[in-house]
UniProtKB/Swiss-Prot annotation:
The modification Phosphotyrosine is found at Y86. PROSITE patterns: TYR_PHOSPHATASE_1, TYR_PHOSPHATASE_2, TYR_PHOSPHATASE_PTP. Contains 5 Potential PXXP motifs that may mediate interaction with the SH3 domains of dock/dreadlocks. This is Tyrosine-protein phosphatase non-receptor type 61F. It comes from Drosophila melanogaster. A motif (PXXP motif (SH3-binding) 3) lies at residues 394-397. The chain crosses the membrane at residues 526-545. A motif (PXXP motif (SH3-binding) 1) lies at residues 327-330. Pfam families: Y_phosphatase. Residues 546-548 are extracellular. Residues 502-517 have a biased composition (Basic and acidic residues). GO terms for molecular function: non-membrane spanning protein tyrosine phosphatase activity; protein kinase binding; protein sequestering activity; protein tyrosine phosphatase activity. Coiled coil: none annotated. It catalyses: O-phospho-L-tyrosyl-[protein] + H2O = L-tyrosyl-[protein] + phosphate.
């Protein structure tokens, strides 16, 4: 389709009618339409011989969150500082829309330093986060920013020579906006970096309405972080292709409609996919993209919509509850690598064997640290559930998670079996990546062949060495479990005990109700017998008087 420069609301209205017609026409066969787009993009990638060899290198596999989501070599971001130049990220561009983004995965515990180094080197002005840290009780992204304001609370990344300080925070109904001071320790230069954290993308699905998403897009645009005169904005979810691709597709198409009065949505998607594989993971995400584009043509030119201010909920120091954070990683990481004895595979092997001995399925070797952490914690949850009281009441809660249907909890998502998630597609492609508890784990990387012995046991590697190799230096003399993590553990145990007490109270009340019902039944039976006796007595007395 040709795209000649036009102007005026009439062209935008015509574009809206054209996209609406295509949307309605493809509606009955939407999944086939999505599949055809994917096949076209895959065919073009093969014809152009797009490779992913860097992501498959022996030394880089452990830096990928998902095994099936690898950056193309021709568009990957190359880190300049340090011994590691690889990060799972691509520069995605659409020249005629004057848009460029960096699409990347949610940082792992060992890639936080790489992530911020990329932000610094690429001169990015903003980070757009479209997921929660945990969803469906699975870690989707490591917490990569400081929790509290102040220089003394800054995140220190000495190996990549950067510090990250939280300087401002604003919480809105549908997103959180954070301002960071990113400082280069080599030059002592500092730069302000904004983070737009979209917090109400529903559990494993798509937003019910594009309005909140469009308001978020407007706020991002108004900040100027998408302009060509600044570095590309960093966009991520968990895999960096589903929700991230949705954001980029909607933004690019709306820009093209403003500039040219027309847009071929499927063509734009294929162009974006030529920079990073798999953008828009599901047919539902493509469906939502069309809805957002159609609605955005109208809303982003409506003064009422544009002038409406997003309600500010708070601008206080950020605090997280136990439910909002993943299980503390440092104690787990230490336990995974401390050897039990010479030539031993360490506590990880012991935990894995114990889990398998108790009936849990074995898990594949292609696991990231987050996935391993999920596996061990979930096995602990199973064990706790097995010892719960067997009465026909709800079992003891095994984890302090929020089970409401609200999307407002922006760091922890709840469980929804009926929806499909952008990352679920990649977690369930390979059967040997299945989670032994919930049926899926965000499986990612294969350990190196020379790191696994004949018993499939991974030799111990000091945590300090792991962090130094991946952009994070540990604090000298730091204990495996910090006071903060110990406090979290105690609070979690106290909360667990409180929940257990509540369930026991429920059981006690049920027993009391059962006893009351039984007593009432006995009373009713006794009254029935007494009434029957009285009736019989009256009849006998009446008969006696008549006969007498």
């Amino acid at each position: 389709m040709s795209e000649q420069k036009t102007s005026g609301s009439g062209s935008a209205a015509a574009a809206r009618l054209q996209i609406e017609a295509e949307y309605k026409d493809k509606g009955p066969q939407w999944h086939r339409f999505y599949k055809e787009i994917c096949e076209t993009c895959d065919r073009e990638a093969k014809e152009k011989q797009f490779s992913t060899s860097e992501s498959e290198r022996h030394t880089n596999r452990g830096l990928n969150r998902y095994r099936d989501v690898n950056p193309y070599d021709h568009s990957r971001i190359v880190l300049k500082r340090g011994s590691v130049d690889y990060i799972n990220a691509n520069l995605v561009q659409l020249e005629r829309a004057e848009r460029q983004y960096i699409l990347t995965q949610g940082p792992l515990v060992d890639t936080v330093g790489h992530f911020w180094l990329m932000v610094w080197e690429q001169k990015s002005r903003a980070v757009l986060m479209l997921n929660k840290l945990m969803e469906k009780k699975q870690i989707k992204c490591h917490l990569y920013w400081p929790n509290e304001m102040g220089a003394d609370k800054a995140l220190k990344l000495p190996h990549v020579k950067l510090t990250v300080e939280l300087v401002r925070l604003e919480t809105y109904q549908n997103f959180v906006r954070r301002w960071f001071k990113l400082t280069d320790l080599e030059t002592q230069q500092s730069r302000e970096v904004m983070q737009f954290h979209y917090t109400t993308w529903p559990d494993f699905g798509i937003p019910s309405s594009p309005n909140a998403f469009l308001k978020f897009l407007q706020q991002v645009r108004d900040s100027g972080c998408l302009s060509r005169d600044v570095g590309p904005a960093v966009v991520h979810c968990s895999a960096g292709i589903g929700r991230s691709g949705t954001f980029c597709l909607v933004d690019c198409c709306l820009v093209l409609i403003d500039k040219y009065g027309e847009c071929n949505v499927s063509k734009v998607l294929c162009e974006l996919r030529s920079y990073r594989m798999g953008l828009i993971q599901t047919a539902d995400q493509l469906d939502f993209s069309y809805q957002a584009i159609i609605e955005g043509i109208k809303k982003l030119h409506d003064p009422t919509f544009l002038d409406a201010e997003e309600p500010l909920i708070s601008n206080d120091t950020e605090t997280h509850t136990l439910d909002e954070l993943p299980p503390p990683l440092p104690p787990r990481v230490q336990s995974l690598n401390l050897p039990l004895a010479p030539n031993s595979g360490g506590i990880l092997s012991l935990n894995m064997r114990a889990a398998q001995a108790n009936g849990a399925e074995s898990i594949g070797k292609e696991l990231s640290k987050d996935a391993l952490n999920n596996f061990i914690n979930q096995h602990d949850m199973i064990h706790d559930a097995e010892v719960a009281d067997s009465r026909p009441l709800p079992p003891l809660p095994v984890r302090a998670f929020n089970d409401s249907d609200s999307d407002e909890d922006y760091l922890l998502d709840d469980d929804d079996e009926d929806d499909t998630d952008e990352d679920e597609e990649y977690e369930t492609i390979n059967e040997h990546d299945a989670d032994p508890v919930n049926g899926h784990v965000p499986a990612t990387t294969q350990p190196h062949a020379d790191d696994v012995n004949a018993n499939n046991e991974k030799p111990a590697v000091p945590v300090d060495e792991q962090h130094k190799a991946n952009g994070i230096d540990p604090i000298p003399g730091q204990l495996p479990a910090s006071p903060e993590n110990e406090l979290k553990r105690r609070k979690r145990n106290e909360y667990q005990a409180s929940l257990e007490q509540k369930v026991n109270d429920m059981k006690r009340k049920q027993r009391e109700n059962e006893d009351k019902q039984l007593a009432a039944k006995k009373r009713r039976s006794l009254l029935t017998y007494i009434a029957a006796g009285v009736v019989v007595g009256v009849i006998c007395a009446y008969a006696y008087t008549k006969l007498g």
